[in-house]
Amino acid sequence: MSSSALDQILVTGSGYTREVRLLSPEKRDPVHLCLILDAEFYLDRIGAEAKISSLLARDSFPPTVFAFVSHIDNAHRHRDYACDSRYSAFLANEVVDEVANRFPSLAGNRHSVCGLSLSGLAAACLVLHYPRRFAGAACQSGSFWWNGEWLTGNFPDLSGKRFYLSVGNGETQAGISHQPSGMRQEVSQLDACRRFAEKAAQMSHRVRFEVFEGGHEMEPWGEELPEALEWLITEICDLS
């Protein structure tokens, strides 16, 4: 028997409508919620459903419901994931509340969030701006270079969050523009991620920083995903 079940819902509110796919344990009531941004990348290109189902099948892994939130397309990604306050509010309120209503066993507000590239930036932004709802984030090659490393330079005065941060040793490009919005990247992913990790540690957050072999690619993100989620969610649930 499969250890998990995948459902599909639509969440509407604050001017947004997003498809959300839910992956939850079959035999245990979930006590933790993890939002996965960039659902299309994680499900269609990384194979996250099988990887996470293997985690859920282990008794040692905290029973968790994973909510994969659609990004629609690249234009929406560039708008929504650039620390957009309205979209962050939609995730923290409408999406979390809709999932929590379906799983009454979810304990409190110590949720987590996971993303890659721009959605990795959005994941960190969500944790720092909604600390009462989120306890930590997994940020795979997060785009912390965005807007002159704005998030690194504007840390809220709080501590105690969990961050799994990773980046490839080949992510050294700088001085480039990203389509379709022309978003400008002046510093490398590698340098920006390292500086964000250092700042988070200075602010007394618990940080695990990994530099993997490779570039800005799906394959290494997929390879490290189970370990990233296991570390993050176990860290959070052990404190609950």
Where is each model-derived feature located?
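Non-catalytic cap/lid and distal C-terminal segments of serine-dependent acyl enzymes
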Residues: 1-240
